[in-house]
Curated annotation (Swiss-Prot):
The lineage of its organism: Bacteria, Bacillati, Cyanobacteriota, Cyanophyceae, Synechococcales. The keyword Transcription does not apply. GO terms for cellular component: ribonucleoprotein complex; ribosome. GO terms for molecular function: rRNA binding; structural constituent of ribosome. Residues 41-51 have a biased composition (Polar residues). Part of the 50S ribosomal subunit. GO terms for biological process: translation. Residues 60-71 have a biased composition (Basic residues). This is Large ribosomal subunit protein uL4. InterPro entries: Ribosomal_uL4 (IPR002136), Ribosomal_uL4-like (IPR013005), Ribosomal_uL4_dom_sf (IPR023574). It comes from Synechocystis sp. (strain ATCC 27184 / PCC 6803 / Kazusa). Keywords: Ribonucleoprotein, Ribosomal protein, RNA-binding, rRNA-binding.
C-alpha cells in the first residue's frame, strides 16, 4: 500500500490517495530491482566499441630489420602491440550487451521500485487546463509549490501528456515527463521527487496493480 498526499494547483493539501501494488518480498526486493535496473542500462548500450588487433591494423607486413646482427631487440612487425601505433591486445569488439528478464519479474521489480519511492511521491490534481499555451516558468514554479527541490531531478507522471504541458516541460533540464503506462525502473529510481496526477495514479493501478 502506497499512501500519498494530494495537492491542488496552488500546492495546498486537499486529500490523500493510495496505491495498492504487489511487491517483492523484503529479502528479494533489492536483488530483483537491481537485476531489472542493470538489464535496462545494458539494453540501452550500443555495443559498437571496436579496436583493431595487430592483424587488422594497416601495414606491418614487412620485418622492420633483420633478426640478428643489429644489436637491437628482435622485431617482426611495426604493428606489434608493444609498438606505438600497433594493434590492441584483447581490445573491445562489437557485441550485444542485452539481457533477458521474464516479464513477470520486470513488472514485479517496477512495482517494488514505485512502492519504495512512496516518501518522495506527491499526487496532484489534473492541471492540463492551466496551460492554454506553453509556459515553462509556470510549470517550474508549480513543481516547486508541489515540493520539488530546485535543480533536483523530478519525474512527472501523467495519464496523457497534453502538448502544451510537454512543450512547457521540455526545456526544464531536471524534469522528465512520462505516461503512466510507459514507466521504466531507471527513471523511477533516479528521480529525487515523483509528481503524479490523480488520474495517472489510477492508470498505474490499472496497468501495474495486481
Amino acid at each position: 500500500m502506497v499512501d500519498c498526499i494530494v495537492k491542488n494547483w496552488q500546492g495546498e493539501e486537499v486529500g490523500n490517495a493510495s496505491l495498492t501494488l504487489r511487491v517483492a518480498k523484503e529479502e528479494n526486493a533489492a536483488h530483483i530491482v537491481h537485476r531489472a535496473l542493470v538489464r535496462q542500462q545494458n539494453n540501452a548500450r550500443q555495443g559498437n566499441a571496436s579496436a583493431k588487433t595487430r592483424a587488422e591494423v594497416r601495414g606491418g607486413g614487412r620485418k622492420p630489420w633483420k633478426q640478428k646482427g643489429t644489436g637491437r631487440a628482435r622485431a617482426g612487425s611495426i604493428r606489434s602491440p608493444l609498438w606505438r601505433g600497433g594493434g590492441v591486445i584483447f581490445g573491445p569488439k562489437p557485441r550485444d550487451y542485452s539481457q533477458k528478464m521474464n516479464r513477470k519479474e520486470r513488472r514485479l521489480a517496477l512495482r517494488t521500485a514505485i512502492a519504495s519511492r512512496a516518501d518522495n511521491m506527491v499526487v496532484v490534481e489534473a492541471f492540463g487546463d492551466q496551460f492554454s499555451q506553453p509556459k515553462t516558468k509556470e510549470l517550474a514554479t508549480a513543481l516547486t509549490r508541489w515540493g520539488a527541490k530546485p535543480e533536483k531531478r523530478v519525474l512527472l507522471i501523467l495519464d496523457e501528456i497534453p502538448e502544451n504541458v510537454f512543450l512547457s516541460g521540455r526545456n526544464i533540464p531536471y524534469l522528465k515527463i512520462l505516461r503512466a503506462d510507459n514507466l521504466n525502473i531507471y527513471d523511477v529510481l533516479v528521480a529525487d521527487t515523483i509528481v503524479a496526477t490523480a488520474t495517472a495514479l489510477e492508470k498505474i493501478q490499472e496497468v501495474y496493480g495486481e
